[in-house]
A protein has these predicted regions:
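Non-heme di-metal
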Residues: 2-247
Length: 247
């Protein structure tokens, strides 16, 4: 009887679960009516992908848990962020993002860069309670191309959040009021065009903010449970250019 060997550390276990994928150019399809501006703002925040990678690269120069596989996994996660940036740039090119939103997103990025906190802590707050709201926004308000991009990035981000949470626990890093305030302000900016409540929960700003709050405090959001299964678009209903490509 063959019994598979258990990985030497949780970092190695996470690394082994990764799946390789290739960013593809997408075409613009139909967005959910009423959600167009939210998608534009969420796409503008793609400018945070590279800084998150930089936060992790920065952390690798200092103290990290002396656990097998930790540095290798974090280095691999930095490369993922570059890939996410390429994939989201393809989506932004397809849909077009207003220069006003791009400029405002850059100011939000500046606020995250200037906040003096441990880089892994900033990364985990962004990934867990901002990116994991933006990705379901692409899925529920977006088109086929955005849903595919969201699914590919989500798989990576699950690994990133798990790894960065482990690092924060090992180093005794905890979030605080300032970080939480910036997290809420970032999500609120994305949701500006939505009413608090709407007949469609996905067009309700309260739904998305409650999801971010829950992800921040508890690491999960019941309202987003339906996004856990990687729902892939059916091949017969999809333009080939919008289908996932696995290396």
């Amino acid at each position: 009887l063959f019994i598979p060997m258990k990985p030497d550390s949780p970092y190695i276990h996470l690394h082994e679960r990764k799946r390789t994928w290739t960013p593809v150019q997408v075409s613009a399809g139909q967005l959910l009516t009423g959600g167009e501006e939210v998608v534009q703002r969420a796409l503008a925040l793609r400018c945070l992908e590279i800084p998150v990678g930089d936060f992790i690269a920065d952390a690798m120069k200092g103290d990290l848990p002396d656990i097998k596989g930790c540095k290798e996994l974090l280095a691999s996660n930095v490369i993922d962020e570059e890939k996410h940036d390429i994939a989201l740039n393809f989506a932004a090119e397809a849909h077009g993002v207003s220069p006003q939103f791009e400029a405002e997103a850059e100011r939000i990025k500046k606020a995250w860069l200037e906040l003096d906190r441990h880089p892994v802590l900033k990364a985990v707050v962004l990934e867990r309670s901002v990116f994991f709201v933006l990705l379901p926004i692409f899925r529920f308000l977006g088109d086929t191309g955005l849903r595919t991009t969201s699914a590919d990035i989500s798989r990576d981000e699950q690994t990133h959040v798990a790894a960065n949470t482990l690092v924060c626990e090992e180093l005794g890093l905890k979030s605080d009021k300032e970080l939480n305030k910036l997290r809420r302000a970032t999500v609120a900016w994305v949701l500006q065009s939505l009413k608090g409540e709407d007949t469609s929960k996905h067009l309700s700003s309260n739904f998305w903010m409650a999801s971010s709050d829950s992800l921040y405090t508890r690491g999960k959001a019941e309202g987003l449970l339906s996004t856990r299964a990687s729902r892939m678009p059916a091949f017969f209903e999809t333009n080939n250019v919008n289908l996932p490509q696995y290396a």
